Amino acid sequence: MPRTENDTWDLASSVGATATMVAAARAVATRAEDPVIDDPYAEPLVRAVGIDFFAKLASGELTPEDLDVSGDESPVGMSRFADGMAARTRFFDDFFTDACAAGVRQAVILASGLDARGYRLTWPEGMTLFEIDQPEVIEFKRTTLAGLGATPSTHLATVAIDLREDWPTALRDAGFDPSVPTAWIAEGLLGYLPPDAQDRLLDTIGELSASGSRLAVESVPSQQSADQDEMREKMKDSTDRWRSHGFDLDFSELVFLGERANVPDYLRERGWAVTATPTNDLLTRYGLAPLDTDEGFAEVVYVNAAR
Protein backbone atom coordinates (compact mmCIF):
# COMPACT_ATOMS: atom_id res chain seq x y z
CA MET A 1 0.00 0.00 0.00
CA PRO A 2 1.43 3.44 -0.92
CA ARG A 3 2.47 5.81 1.84
CA THR A 4 0.11 8.41 3.32
CA GLU A 5 1.13 11.30 5.54
CA ASN A 6 -0.42 9.80 8.70
CA ASP A 7 0.39 6.11 8.19
CA THR A 8 1.78 3.84 10.91
CA TRP A 9 4.32 1.01 10.96
CA ASP A 10 6.67 -1.09 13.08
CA LEU A 11 10.12 -2.53 12.41
CA ALA A 12 8.63 -5.45 10.49
CA SER A 13 6.27 -3.52 8.22
CA SER A 14 6.08 -0.63 5.78
CA VAL A 15 8.78 2.02 6.11
CA GLY A 16 9.86 0.56 9.46
CA ALA A 17 11.15 -2.52 7.66
CA THR A 18 13.68 -0.32 5.87
CA ALA A 19 15.45 0.22 9.21
CA THR A 20 15.69 -3.55 9.56
CA MET A 21 16.91 -3.87 5.96
CA VAL A 22 19.66 -1.29 6.55
CA ALA A 23 20.70 -2.98 9.80
CA ALA A 24 20.95 -6.27 7.90
CA ALA A 25 23.18 -4.53 5.36
CA ARG A 26 25.36 -3.23 8.21
CA ALA A 27 25.68 -6.80 9.49
CA VAL A 28 26.76 -7.93 6.02
CA ALA A 29 29.27 -5.07 5.82
CA THR A 30 30.64 -5.88 9.28
CA ARG A 31 31.45 -9.43 8.12
CA ALA A 32 33.39 -8.20 5.07
CA GLU A 33 37.01 -9.25 4.67
CA ASP A 34 38.20 -5.65 5.06
CA PRO A 35 35.23 -3.99 6.79
CA VAL A 36 34.56 -0.29 6.49
CA ILE A 37 32.40 -0.38 9.63
CA ASP A 38 32.05 -2.50 12.76
CA ASP A 39 28.51 -2.84 14.09
CA PRO A 40 28.33 -5.87 16.41
CA TYR A 41 24.73 -5.05 17.33
CA ALA A 42 23.31 -5.10 13.81
CA GLU A 43 22.85 -8.86 13.54
CA PRO A 44 21.20 -9.45 16.95
CA LEU A 45 18.87 -6.49 16.47
CA VAL A 46 17.78 -7.81 13.07
CA ARG A 47 17.26 -11.28 14.50
CA ALA A 48 15.10 -9.83 17.26
CA VAL A 49 12.82 -8.07 14.76
CA GLY A 50 11.92 -11.49 13.40
CA ILE A 51 11.81 -11.00 9.63
CA ASP A 52 13.25 -14.34 8.52
CA PHE A 53 14.65 -13.01 5.24
CA PHE A 54 16.67 -10.25 6.91
CA ALA A 55 17.69 -12.49 9.84
CA LYS A 56 19.21 -14.98 7.39
CA LEU A 57 20.95 -12.18 5.53
CA ALA A 58 22.31 -10.64 8.73
CA SER A 59 23.65 -13.96 10.00
CA GLY A 60 25.23 -15.02 6.72
CA GLU A 61 22.87 -17.95 6.15
CA LEU A 62 21.72 -16.04 3.07
CA THR A 63 24.45 -14.17 1.21
CA PRO A 64 24.21 -11.11 -1.03
CA GLU A 65 25.43 -13.31 -3.87
CA ASP A 66 22.30 -15.44 -3.45
CA LEU A 67 20.30 -12.36 -4.39
CA ASP A 68 22.59 -10.94 -7.07
CA VAL A 69 21.42 -12.80 -10.15
CA SER A 70 23.68 -12.74 -13.18
CA GLY A 71 22.15 -10.64 -15.94
CA ASP A 72 19.63 -9.01 -13.59
CA GLU A 73 18.84 -5.48 -14.77
CA SER A 74 17.46 -4.18 -11.48
CA PRO A 75 19.10 -0.94 -10.32
CA VAL A 76 21.32 -2.26 -7.54
CA GLY A 77 22.15 -5.71 -6.18
CA MET A 78 22.41 -6.61 -2.52
CA SER A 79 26.22 -6.70 -2.60
CA ARG A 80 26.35 -3.13 -3.85
CA PHE A 81 23.58 -2.13 -1.48
CA ALA A 82 25.65 -3.43 1.44
CA ASP A 83 28.64 -1.45 0.16
CA GLY A 84 26.48 1.65 -0.08
CA MET A 85 25.16 1.23 3.45
CA ALA A 86 28.69 0.64 4.75
CA ALA A 87 29.87 3.90 3.17
CA ARG A 88 26.78 5.74 4.40
CA THR A 89 27.22 4.45 7.94
CA ARG A 90 30.90 5.38 7.95
CA PHE A 91 30.10 8.87 6.67
CA PHE A 92 27.78 9.53 9.61
CA ASP A 93 30.17 7.85 12.06
CA ASP A 94 32.98 10.12 10.88
CA PHE A 95 30.66 13.13 11.06
CA PHE A 96 30.09 12.52 14.77
CA THR A 97 33.79 11.87 15.38
CA ASP A 98 34.74 15.15 13.71
CA ALA A 99 32.02 17.10 15.53
CA CYS A 100 33.20 15.80 18.89
CA ALA A 101 36.81 16.60 18.01
CA ALA A 102 35.66 20.18 17.35
CA GLY A 103 34.17 20.38 20.84
CA VAL A 104 30.50 19.62 20.20
CA ARG A 105 29.01 17.82 23.20
CA GLN A 106 25.36 17.47 22.20
CA ALA A 107 24.10 15.29 19.35
CA VAL A 108 20.73 14.25 17.94
CA ILE A 109 19.87 11.24 15.79
CA LEU A 110 16.56 11.79 13.99
CA ALA A 111 14.51 8.65 13.27
CA SER A 112 17.18 6.51 14.93
CA GLY A 113 15.65 3.13 14.09
CA LEU A 114 18.14 0.33 14.83
CA ASP A 115 21.08 2.74 14.96
CA ALA A 116 23.42 1.59 17.75
CA ARG A 117 25.90 4.48 17.71
CA GLY A 118 25.04 5.23 21.32
CA TYR A 119 26.51 1.82 22.15
CA ARG A 120 29.22 1.11 19.59
CA LEU A 121 30.98 4.47 19.10
CA THR A 122 33.49 5.99 21.50
CA TRP A 123 32.20 9.32 22.79
CA PRO A 124 34.01 12.02 24.79
CA GLU A 125 33.31 12.86 28.41
CA GLY A 126 30.41 15.25 28.89
CA MET A 127 28.60 14.09 25.76
CA THR A 128 24.82 13.74 25.54
CA LEU A 129 23.28 11.84 22.65
CA PHE A 130 19.55 12.17 21.94
CA GLU A 131 17.73 9.55 19.88
CA ILE A 132 14.31 10.35 18.43
CA ASP A 133 11.95 7.71 17.07
CA GLN A 134 8.52 6.22 17.60
CA PRO A 135 7.93 4.86 21.12
CA GLU A 136 7.70 1.22 20.00
CA VAL A 137 11.01 1.46 18.13
CA ILE A 138 12.79 3.11 21.05
CA GLU A 139 11.52 0.51 23.51
CA PHE A 140 12.30 -2.42 21.23
CA LYS A 141 15.91 -1.36 20.77
CA ARG A 142 16.41 -0.55 24.44
CA THR A 143 15.08 -3.88 25.70
CA THR A 144 16.85 -5.91 23.01
CA LEU A 145 20.24 -4.35 23.68
CA ALA A 146 19.74 -4.63 27.43
CA GLY A 147 19.00 -8.32 26.94
CA LEU A 148 22.37 -8.64 25.21
CA GLY A 149 24.07 -7.04 28.20
CA ALA A 150 24.94 -3.94 26.17
CA THR A 151 25.21 -0.58 27.90
CA PRO A 152 25.38 2.88 26.29
CA SER A 153 28.86 4.28 25.71
CA THR A 154 27.68 7.81 26.50
CA HIS A 155 24.82 9.59 28.20
CA LEU A 156 21.98 8.42 25.97
CA ALA A 157 18.64 10.23 26.18
CA THR A 158 15.78 8.68 24.23
CA VAL A 159 12.91 10.79 22.91
CA ALA A 160 9.97 8.54 22.10
CA ILE A 161 7.90 10.51 19.63
CA ASP A 162 6.92 10.46 15.97
CA LEU A 163 8.63 13.20 13.95
CA ARG A 164 5.19 14.22 12.67
CA GLU A 165 4.32 15.32 16.20
CA ASP A 166 5.79 18.11 18.37
CA TRP A 167 9.22 16.57 18.65
CA PRO A 168 11.09 19.84 19.41
CA THR A 169 9.15 20.22 22.68
CA ALA A 170 9.74 16.57 23.54
CA LEU A 171 13.44 17.02 22.78
CA ARG A 172 13.71 20.02 25.08
CA ASP A 173 11.81 18.15 27.78
CA ALA A 174 14.43 15.39 27.54
CA GLY A 175 17.18 17.90 28.35
CA PHE A 176 18.18 19.27 24.96
CA ASP A 177 19.77 22.73 25.17
CA PRO A 178 19.28 24.80 21.99
CA SER A 179 21.77 27.40 23.21
CA VAL A 180 24.80 25.11 22.74
CA PRO A 181 26.21 23.63 19.51
CA THR A 182 24.58 20.42 18.33
CA ALA A 183 25.55 17.71 15.85
CA TRP A 184 22.47 16.47 13.99
CA ILE A 185 22.10 13.51 11.66
CA ALA A 186 19.15 12.52 9.49
CA GLU A 187 20.37 9.24 8.01
CA GLY A 188 18.15 7.52 5.47
CA LEU A 189 15.24 9.79 6.35
CA LEU A 190 14.52 12.52 3.81
CA GLY A 191 13.37 10.23 1.01
CA TYR A 192 10.62 8.90 3.28
CA LEU A 193 9.29 12.40 3.94
CA PRO A 194 6.93 14.34 1.69
CA PRO A 195 8.80 17.27 0.09
CA ASP A 196 7.14 19.89 2.31
CA ALA A 197 7.90 17.82 5.42
CA GLN A 198 11.56 17.72 4.38
CA ASP A 199 11.62 21.52 4.30
CA ARG A 200 9.90 21.80 7.68
CA LEU A 201 12.37 19.39 9.24
CA LEU A 202 15.38 21.31 7.93
CA ASP A 203 13.84 24.61 9.06
CA THR A 204 13.19 23.24 12.55
CA ILE A 205 16.73 21.93 12.85
CA GLY A 206 17.96 25.39 11.91
CA GLU A 207 15.79 27.01 14.56
CA LEU A 208 17.23 24.68 17.21
CA SER A 209 20.87 25.04 16.13
CA ALA A 210 23.17 27.44 17.94
CA SER A 211 26.29 28.82 16.29
CA GLY A 212 28.82 26.02 15.95
CA SER A 213 26.19 23.39 15.18
CA ARG A 214 26.60 20.79 12.46
CA LEU A 215 24.20 18.76 10.34
CA ALA A 216 24.67 15.65 8.19
CA VAL A 217 21.94 14.40 5.83
CA GLU A 218 21.47 12.63 2.54
CA SER A 219 20.07 14.62 -0.35
CA VAL A 220 17.89 12.44 -2.55
CA PRO A 221 17.35 13.57 -6.15
CA SER A 222 14.22 15.44 -7.10
CA GLN A 223 12.00 13.44 -9.43
CA GLN A 224 10.15 15.15 -12.25
CA SER A 225 6.67 13.77 -12.87
CA ALA A 226 7.78 12.01 -16.06
CA ASP A 227 10.54 10.18 -14.18
CA GLN A 228 8.53 8.88 -11.24
CA ASP A 229 6.99 5.83 -12.92
CA GLU A 230 10.38 4.77 -14.24
CA MET A 231 11.93 5.13 -10.78
CA ARG A 232 9.16 3.09 -9.15
CA GLU A 233 9.64 0.33 -11.72
CA LYS A 234 13.36 0.24 -10.99
CA MET A 235 12.68 -0.01 -7.26
CA LYS A 236 10.18 -2.82 -7.83
CA ASP A 237 12.77 -4.71 -9.86
CA SER A 238 15.22 -4.44 -6.95
CA THR A 239 12.88 -6.22 -4.55
CA ASP A 240 11.22 -8.74 -6.89
CA ARG A 241 14.05 -11.22 -6.40
CA TRP A 242 13.56 -11.06 -2.60
CA ARG A 243 10.06 -12.50 -2.89
CA SER A 244 11.47 -15.92 -3.74
CA HIS A 245 13.10 -15.86 -0.31
CA GLY A 246 9.83 -15.13 1.48
CA PHE A 247 10.02 -11.35 1.88
CA ASP A 248 7.20 -9.52 0.14
CA LEU A 249 7.31 -5.76 0.54
CA ASP A 250 7.33 -3.29 -2.33
CA PHE A 251 9.82 -0.57 -1.43
CA SER A 252 8.64 1.53 -4.36
CA GLU A 253 5.52 2.27 -2.29
CA LEU A 254 7.46 3.50 0.75
CA VAL A 255 9.13 6.63 -0.58
CA PHE A 256 7.67 10.00 -1.51
CA LEU A 257 8.85 10.73 -5.04
CA GLY A 258 8.36 14.02 -6.78
CA GLU A 259 9.98 17.41 -6.94
CA ARG A 260 11.66 18.54 -3.73
CA ALA A 261 14.17 21.11 -2.60
CA ASN A 262 17.84 20.54 -3.34
CA VAL A 263 19.18 20.10 0.19
CA PRO A 264 22.64 21.67 -0.28
CA ASP A 265 21.11 24.77 -1.89
CA TYR A 266 18.29 24.92 0.66
CA LEU A 267 20.74 24.90 3.56
CA ARG A 268 23.11 27.41 1.98
CA GLU A 269 20.22 29.81 1.51
CA ARG A 270 19.58 29.56 5.26
CA GLY A 271 23.08 30.35 6.41
CA TRP A 272 24.74 26.94 6.56
CA ALA A 273 28.21 26.33 5.11
CA VAL A 274 27.74 23.16 3.06
CA THR A 275 29.96 20.42 1.68
CA ALA A 276 28.18 17.98 -0.66
CA THR A 277 29.79 14.62 -1.46
CA PRO A 278 28.40 12.41 -4.26
CA THR A 279 27.88 8.74 -3.43
CA ASN A 280 30.70 7.56 -5.70
CA ASP A 281 33.18 9.92 -4.05
CA LEU A 282 32.15 8.46 -0.71
CA LEU A 283 32.53 4.87 -1.93
CA THR A 284 35.97 5.65 -3.34
CA ARG A 285 36.99 7.36 -0.10
CA TYR A 286 36.36 4.14 1.81
CA GLY A 287 37.96 1.83 -0.73
CA LEU A 288 34.73 0.55 -2.31
CA ALA A 289 33.94 0.28 -6.01
CA PRO A 290 31.88 3.15 -7.46
CA LEU A 291 28.39 2.65 -8.84
CA ASP A 292 27.37 2.99 -12.46
CA THR A 293 25.32 6.12 -13.08
CA ASP A 294 22.11 4.12 -13.57
CA GLU A 295 22.44 2.12 -10.35
CA GLY A 296 19.93 2.67 -7.58
CA PHE A 297 21.40 5.32 -5.30
CA ALA A 298 24.24 6.68 -7.45
CA GLU A 299 22.62 10.14 -7.50
CA VAL A 300 22.37 10.49 -3.71
CA VAL A 301 24.54 13.27 -2.28
CA TYR A 302 25.85 13.31 1.29
CA VAL A 303 25.67 16.70 2.94
CA ASN A 304 27.83 18.00 5.77
CA ALA A 305 26.74 21.46 6.94
CA ALA A 306 27.93 23.84 9.65
CA ARG A 307 26.88 27.22 10.99
Curated annotation (Swiss-Prot):
Where do the annotations place S-adenosyl-L-methionine binding? Answer: 133, 162-163
Keyword Secreted tagged? no
User: Which GO biological process annotations does it have?
Assistant: methylation
UniProt keywords, alphabetically: Methyltransferase, S-adenosyl-L-methionine, Transferase
Source domain of life is: Bacteria
Q: Which Pfam families match?
A: LCM
Query: Which InterPro entries does this UniProt record tie to the protein?
Result: Ppm1/Ppm2/Tcmp, SAM-dependent_MTases_sf, SAM_mthyl_Trfase_ML2640-like
At the top of the EC hierarchy, this enzyme's class is: transferase
- In the Enzyme Commission scheme, what number(s) does this protein have? 2.1.1.-
- Region called Disordered, residue ranges: 213-234
Give the GO molecular function terms. Answer: methyltransferase activity
Q: Record's NCBIfam families?
A: mthyl_TIGR00027
Describe its function: Exhibits S-adenosyl-L-methionine-dependent methyltransferase activity.
Q: Which family does it belong to?
A: Belongs to the UPF0677 family.
Could you tell me what this protein is called?
Putative S-adenosyl-L-methionine-dependent methyltransferase Mflv_5023
Please give the organism.
Answer: Mycolicibacterium gilvum (strain PYR-GCK)
